[in-house]
């Protein structure tokens, strides 16, 4: 198996992806830049298609049901592009369901949230106990769905694992400025552009879009992993602080010198595999 160091992945992203994201004139161009992400590999076989709550969904593996909400800043990403993570969780004993929720700018807020909520509701009704995970925008969706279901008295997952959650679409975290030169992939302007495209005039403090502003009491145990040098670091840190004040069991780990969503490299990067295995163990233990 090829081995990729975090430094090599960061260098690739800084040279090949970040400039294209920074200077993209349209979201279509930016989505193409996302597709240039470091060439992480996943097996082609073993992925099946179905629908969950009317949402096209890709599934793989067998075992504990896990709904995985992919990232992509609400305008990019597909279940196929996140197969490395799905395959990684499947190898840890989960049946992974990755919904293809609707994306901006064609589908604006709250389309992605509604799709994520519908997919979770359908899977929970079908399978009962369900684990939940996601990265970046998808991690934010996962948190928003849980907060909404708790508010409405609906069942919650036994636990959730979140990688670099985007919890504040108002982009007010200090790290969005402090880490702009260190983050190998994103700029603050790009986050704001993505936020505006998805929200289309809706409030960035709507808890369905930004779970940082949600009522958090009563949420299940959470594990959050985030990179020290990424723009979204403080989205994670501020959310964890609020969740703990609300009495939510929350495990946080800060990872040095890794790129955003390094778990995509779990097949070739030791740090990616370690993060994914920690998350899988956390979810598995609380699914008992």
Annotated model-derived regions:
Residues 63-73:
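Short beta-strand element of the alpha/beta-hydrolase
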Residues 268-288:
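Catalytic active-site module of serine/aspartate enzymes centered on a nucleophile-bearing elbow/loop
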Residues 147-202:
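Hydrolase active-site cap/lid region
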Residues 132-134, 163, 255:
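Short beta-strand immediately N-terminal to the catalytic nucleophile in serine-hydrolase-like folds
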Residues 224-226:
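Short beta-strand/loop motif that positions the catalytic acidic residue
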Residues 1-59, 288:
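A glycine/proline-hinged amphipathic helix-loop "lid/cap" segment
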Residues 134, 138, 142:
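Gly/Ala-rich beta-loop-alpha elbow adjacent to hydrolase catalytic centers
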Residues 77-79, 85, 97-129, 266-272:
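Catalytic nucleophile-loop/oxyanion-hole region of alpha/beta-hydrolase
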